[in-house]
Amino acid sequence: MTEIINVTAREILDSRGNPTVEVEVAVGTGDVGRAAVPSGASTGEHEALELRDGDKARYLGKGVRKAVANVIDEIAPAVVGLDASDQAALDARMIALDGTPTKSKLGANAILGVSLAAAKAAATAHGLPLYRYVGGAGARTLPVPLMNILNGGAHADSNVDIQEFMVVPLGLPTFAEALRCGAEIFHALKKVLKGKGAATGVGDEGGYAPSLASNEEALAVIMEAIGQAGYEPGKQVALALDCAASEFYDKKAGKYELEGEGKSFDGKGLVEYYAQLAAKYPIVSIEDGCDEDDWATWKLLTERLGGKLQLVGDDLFVTNVTRLARGIEQGVTNSILVKVNQIGSLTETLEAVRMAHRAGYTTVMSHRSGETEDTTIADLAVACDCGQIKTGSASRTDRIAKYNQLLRIEEELGTSGRYAGRSAFKALR
């Protein structure tokens, strides 16, 4: 009854006003699943390919008509008749049809749209919410939100080099209370910034994007906001960084250039810089602390801080099991960021999560800077027992939609649900 009977696609807009792919998959029960594909601003060099049209006369070359056509003309004929409930077989068919390592023929945005829409159609046909359909009866853990309340780097036009400064409400009893905590700190931060004469416009992910003197000043104003909101730093609320270090790494010179504060580091110097920040502030997680191909500095960072902090590989791993396996083998990082569009199918995403968990790595489900109203990743965070989710600040509907879905899931789970809290961070146990 969950045989795929129709697949269609269209071009829609994401939260940055750029085109993206939306797919609908219909199954024999009459149920339809719809999925919209996200898009990143700072993308890893090793990510699956997001197919764009390249026609500068239309959407500045960012149109996705080619990807849409590939769904309708290439993928649909190949998957109609397949069982949407057999996710692995469906994804394998599309991957084989593409035949390239990075899904560059059909586009990862085309393949992923079909993959996610089919899962949603099958879930509806089985009368199950997506988190239960994908995760089974054991899916009951609500993730800790890593809320990006202050933006720098590629996500904002400012002189702050680190891309994301996040508050982590890990000491609250429920997801709903954690979300309230994050929202109240977000509003308190606006007052703090206004008091300093700083701008309170927001970046791609809903966090403020002020021009501050240094990365450390960004941490200091967030600490002030936590206190003004009435929460205890370190106990109730911690901090997390997404450094996006590949964005400020000079590959030729082998140096990390923090231009906003006029500092230049080699690998050892960068590790010590992070260690000093972690000693001064209640930082529990550092993401993309080193360049995506600087395995040597990643190793140094893991040896120096891996026993104390969560070290997350995003651009380093790009949700790819081959790169993750290398990291596990070399003892690099202790966590992986999970982005469905980095690898381009639900099956491969789930494989990466399983590999990480087997190795004792934590997993963080994540949005992209270009998002839509689609809430799939909220369900996947619960389904995969990730324990943590990154989906932006307490503003912009494209971010809030995911938080609201998690509120619904927590309500639906009732007493069987649990908020991951501090236990989500293995390095803190």
Curated annotation (Swiss-Prot):
It comes from the Bacteria. The active site is at E205 (proton donor), K339 (proton acceptor). It holds the Pfam family Enolase_C. The keyword Cytoplasm applies. Its EC number is 4.2.1.11. It is found in: Cytoplasm; Secreted; Cell surface. Its cofactor is Mg(2+). GO terms for molecular function: magnesium ion binding; phosphopyruvate hydratase activity. GO terms for cellular component: cell surface; extracellular region; phosphopyruvate hydratase complex. (2R)-2-phosphoglycerate binds at Q163, K339, R368, S369, K390. Keywords: Cytoplasm, Glycolysis, Lyase, Magnesium, Metal-binding, Secreted. InterPro entries: Enolase (IPR000941), Enolase-like_C_sf (IPR036849), Enolase-like_N (IPR029017), Enolase_C (IPR020810), Enolase_CS (IPR020809), Enolase_N (IPR020811). It catalyses: (2R)-2-phosphoglycerate = phosphoenolpyruvate + H2O. Pathway: Carbohydrate degradation; glycolysis; pyruvate from D-glyceraldehyde 3-phosphate: step 4/5. Mg(2+) binds at D242, E287, D314. Binds a second Mg(2+) ion via substrate during catalysis. One of its GO terms (biological process) is glycolytic process. Catalyzes the reversible conversion of 2-phosphoglycerate (2-PG) into phosphoenolpyruvate (PEP). It is essential for the degradation of carbohydrates via glycolysis. PANTHER family: ENOLASE. Belongs to the enolase family. This is Enolase. It comes from Anaeromyxobacter dehalogenans (strain 2CP-C). The gene is eno.
